[in-house]
């Protein structure tokens, strides 16, 4: 009986309906379809397959029916004929799971060792690495060796470990004699650079017998980078050994910058480094000598190295160091060292104007600041506040009436239903495909359509995909306004500020989870949630899964933000940095600046690029939200602007 059901399912999915649909009542209204969809899912979860089989045919007109078909196919993928999967993929070319199914079925055909069938099913290279390895192995198995070796080489040259499915392909490539030993060296270099010591060791151990001397040296170096000088002196100087030595040297510098600094001349001599290669080593050490704990000799050496460097990011780090210590002479020196292209960035234009104001060249400074004010974001708002003028937001208006042709079609119908069922992440995949396929004008209309439907995260996503930076209403919707109003009431944090944090953290996706476990609108870590719930006696919280509920997340998130805000004297610069990087780091940065600098210099001197950008965004986003809530879009309060940091 069960086997007969499986056959029936496969034939249904292939488009050959063997069930008598007339015996099943078809749901006509959307509400009825939704009810039937919920019943089918419930029956499926309970493994009541006879109920599922009876009800499925009556739901073919429901937008999410392809998702049921997908589940039907993947539940029994091991027994599906290729025609079933092919028909499904062709019938649903824009369905996100259809693309993943294609790669999954390639792997299934490889499991069956149906190599000709695999190539017939997937004449083009599939999407995932595992499927590509199986695809090229199938090429070899069917006599298409040259294509197989080319694919093997592309898949081989990576610093990360590849799926087990790739082992067969790499083995036949190696056995064919077509794998150049230099490919081993190149992959070892990539693995070493990626810090994948285990892969380096495995690869070195697989090298041909006449490479065993270098292989042993590589294994020793990978396991103990501090032997880099021994490696440099005992291996012949080649491009490969120089690159390996440079990677190991970076590890040494990370642990002991002074040891690395003193090692440079010996390393340069042993590996016959040219001036550019020596400067690369100097740059590595200079990055590690940016703290307050360096000696005068180290500081002089560092600045000499940076003065000769061609690394824009390193010079910018030195500019920020000057800003953080209130070193005005150093600020002028290092700004001048920046290449012309870098000097055109908002931050460095502002600080050039700042130096001009200090020298009394007010007209030149104000010209730069007025030019900055024509842009959007943190520094344009800073420029306005610096010269005491109101910053004018430039807002592009999307059409209020969206072209009906854009809101029809299976993709939009699926998005509507996925949002109805609170399946935000799946909806985002559908939405991303839809938005990507449209013109910029159409993307603006889609952003407005999402906004009108209160699909806040999809509205934001459309503006990002279309680079619609001046569509501020769609970029910064007043999402969950009532909840934020309720949970900031009685707290010192402004509602606009809490919303700015949430917008920066999640772009209004309530279901988003970070790789480290931060969850929901305000990206709360489970440990932080537990601590905050206890501290504020918040009832009803029992598990991290609740953080994906908007109300629970906003309740806990605003409470934690209030706690951090109060810790730092109601200063949003500090509390924003602490929300992102932790209160301890903020206190360290404050200790380093020691009241010598202003607010803008403190923000720009934050050493972590992520936190620096985070604080700038949150302050700007707060200004946008205050504007949409009927207030002036001033970047900083008088207290934040006027104090020393």
Regions picked out by a protein language model, each given a short descriptive name:
Residues 2-13:
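Bacterial N-terminal signal peptides that target proteins for export
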Residues 42, 71, 75, 108, ...:
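Residue-level signature for tetratricopeptide repeat
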Residues 46, 75, 79, 108, ...:
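Structural motif corresponding to the intra-repeat A-B loop/turn of tetratricopeptide repeats
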Residues 51-55, 81-91, 114-124, 146-158, ...:
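Alpha-helical repeat scaffolds
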Residues 70, 269, 302, 307, ...:
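Catalytic glycan-binding domains that act on GlcNAc-containing polysaccharides
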């Amino acid at each position: 009986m069960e086997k007969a059901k499986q056959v029936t399912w496969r034939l249904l999915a292939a488009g050959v309906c063997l069930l008598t649909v007339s015996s099943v009542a078809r749901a006509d209204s959307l509400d009825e379809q939704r009810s039937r969809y919920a019943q089918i899912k419930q029956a499926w979860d309970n493994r009541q397959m006879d109920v599922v089989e009876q009800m499925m045919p009556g739901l073919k007109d429901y937008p999410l029916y392809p998702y049921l078909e997908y589940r039907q196919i993947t539940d029994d993928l091991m027994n599906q004929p290729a025609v079933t999967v092919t028909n499904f993929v062709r019938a649903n070319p824009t369905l996100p799971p259809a693309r993943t199914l294609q790669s999954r079925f390639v792997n299934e055909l490889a499991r069956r060792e149906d190599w000709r069938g695999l190539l017939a099913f997937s004449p083009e290279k599939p999407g995932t690495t595992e499927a590509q390895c199986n695809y090229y192995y199938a090429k070899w198995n069917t006599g298409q060796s040259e294509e197989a070796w080319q694919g093997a080489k592309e898949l081989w040259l990576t610093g990360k470990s590849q799926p087990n499915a790739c082992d067969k392909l790499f083995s036949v490539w190696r056995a064919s004699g077509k794998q150049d030993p230099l490919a081993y060296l190149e992959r070892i270099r990539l693995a070493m650079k990626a810090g994948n010591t285990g892969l380096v060791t495995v690869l070195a151990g697989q090298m041909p017998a006449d490479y065993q001397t270098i292989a042993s040296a590589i294994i020793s170096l990978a396991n103990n980078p501090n032997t880099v000088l021994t490696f440099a002196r005992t291996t012949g100087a080649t491009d490969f050994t120089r690159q390996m030595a440079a990677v190991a040297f970076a590890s040494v510098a990370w642990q002991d910058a002074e040891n690395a600094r003193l090692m440079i001349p010996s390393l340069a001599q042993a590996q016959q480094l040219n001036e550019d290669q020596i400067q690369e080593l100097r740059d590595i050490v200079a990055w590690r000598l940016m703290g307050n704990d360096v000696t005068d000799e180290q500081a002089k050496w560092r600045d000499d190295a940076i003065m000769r460097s061609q690394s824009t990011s390193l010079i910018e780090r030195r500019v920020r160091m000057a800003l953080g210590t209130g070193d005005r002479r150093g600020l002028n020196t290092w700004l001048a060292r920046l290449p012309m292209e870098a000097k055109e960035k908002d931050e460095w234009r502002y600080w050039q104007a700042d130096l001009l104001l200090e020298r009394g060249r007010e007209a030149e400074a104000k010209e730069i600041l007025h030019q900055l004010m024509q842009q959007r974001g943190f520094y344009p708002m800073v420029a306005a506040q610096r010269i005491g003028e109101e910053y004018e937001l430039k807002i592009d208006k999307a059409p209020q009436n969206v072209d009906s042709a854009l809101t029809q079609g299976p993709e939009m119908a699926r998005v509507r239903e996925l949002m109805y069922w609170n399946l935000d992440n799946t909806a985002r995949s559908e939405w991303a495909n839809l938005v990507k396929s449209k013109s910029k004008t159409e993307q603006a209309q889609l952003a407005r359509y999402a906004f009108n439907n209160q699909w806040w995260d999809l509205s934001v996503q459309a503006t990002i995909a279309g680079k619609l930076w001046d569509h501020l209403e769609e970029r910064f919707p007043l999402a969950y306004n009532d909840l934020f109003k309720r949970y900031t009431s009685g707290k010192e944090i402004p509602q606009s500020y809490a919303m700015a944090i949430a917008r920066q953290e999640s772009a209004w996706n309530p279901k988003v989870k970070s790789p480290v476990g931060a969850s929901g609108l305000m990206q709360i870590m489970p440990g932080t949630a537990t601590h905050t719930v206890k501290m504020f006696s918040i009832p009803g919280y029992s598990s991290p899964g609740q953080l994906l509920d908007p109300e629970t997340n906003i309740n806990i998130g605003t409470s934690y933000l209030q706690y951090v805000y109060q810790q730092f004297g109601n200063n949003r610069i500090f509390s924003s940095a602490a929300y992102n990087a932790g209160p301890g780091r903020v206190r360290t940065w404050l200790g380093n600046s020691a009241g010598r600098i202003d607010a803008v210099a403190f923000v720009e001197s934050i050493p972590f690029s992520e936190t620096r950008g985070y604080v700038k965004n949150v302050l700007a986003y707060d200004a946008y939200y205050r504007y949409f809530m009927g207030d002036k879009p001033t970047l900083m309060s008088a207290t934040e602007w006027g104090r020393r940091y």
